[in-house]
Design a protein with these regions (language model features):
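Conserved N-terminal beta1-alpha1 strand-loop-helix module at the mouth
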Residues: 1-86, 105, 153, 164-165, ...
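Glycine-rich beta-to-alpha transition loops that act as phosphate-gripper elements at the mouths
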Residues: 20-22, 48, 68-76, 92-96, ...
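Conserved functional loop/turn residues at catalytic and ligand-binding sites
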Residues: 38, 62, 86, 94, ...
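Short catalytic-loop micro-motif centered on adjacent basic/acidic residues
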Residues: 41-44, 90, 132-133, 157
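Histidine/lysine/aspartate-rich catalytic loop segments that bind and position anionic ligands
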Residues: 89, 93-138
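Glycine-rich phosphate-binding active-site loops on the catalytic face of alpha/beta enzymes
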Residues: 89-99, 133-141, 173-196
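A generic hydrophobic-segment detector
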Residues: 118-173
């Protein structure tokens, strides 16, 4: 039941924030700013320093308010570490069937990466709950629309190059949610500690989702 509730939360939010920072303190501040702006689904990538510790801290401090996941999960060892640290979903740039199986075993969401129609179908049939279309900026909204046409039953989450200028186009093209990184959590903004800016951007992305879904 929890897994389905978590999937519904991802789909309702429409935004999965990909968050990176140089310290766990910074990352917690980023997460708080995103939450204040209305984005409550967040992915901590395993490219950040001490990713497991960061996941544990964010889960401890904000786990009851956000849906926390781990990104750049390339193997089962990383997957297990992420799940034990509190991740409720795992995101990958590619498809590793064993990682998907681990998610299913523990009742967590699997969001593997794929790009071609064959890769997307393979990921979904392996048990993906959402397929991350990556790197989506290579083809843009037009490519996502072409994918979605024959595969309307597969939840697609474009990631890579999603910003405020094209977010609406991706949603209209069939995206169930958007994976948003640098255009939402800008590295320079984090370095300056301008978390108000991140809150503002989060609110703008959520406004785009609401507008597209109500028109």
């Amino acid at each position: 039941m929890a897994k389905q509730q978590h999937l519904a939360r991802v789909l309702e939010s429409g935004i999965v924030a990909v968050i990176r920072a140089n310290s766990d303190e910074q990352l917690v501040d980023v997460a708080r700013a995103l939450l204040a702006g209305g984005v409550e689904v967040m992915e901590v990538t395993f490219t950040v320093p001490r990713a497991v510790r960061v996941l544990e801290r964010v889960a401890d401090e904000l786990g009851d308010q956000i849906l926390l996941g781990a990104g750049t999960v390339l193997d089962t060892e990383t997957a297990r570490s992420a799940l034990l640290a509190g991740a409720e979903f795992l995101v990958s740039p590619s498809t590793n069937v064993e990682v998907i199986r681990m998610c299913r075993r523990y009742g967590k969401l699997a969001m593997p990466g794929a790009f071609t129609p064959t890769e997307v179908v393979t990921a979904f049939e392996a048990g993906a709950d959402v397929v991350k279309v990556f790197p989506c900026d290579v083809g843009g909204p037009g490519y996502l629309k072409a994918l979605h046409g024959p595969l309307p039953h597969i939840p697609l989450m474009p990631t890579g190059g999603v910003d405020l200028k094209n977010a609406a186009d991706y949603l209209r093209a069939g995206a169930c949610a958007l994976g948003v990184g640098g255009s939402l959590v800008e590295s320079k903004t984090v370095e300056k500690g301008d978390f108000g800016r991140i809150e503002q951007l989060a609110a703008q992305f959520r406004a785009v989702v609401r507008e597209v879904r109500t028109t």
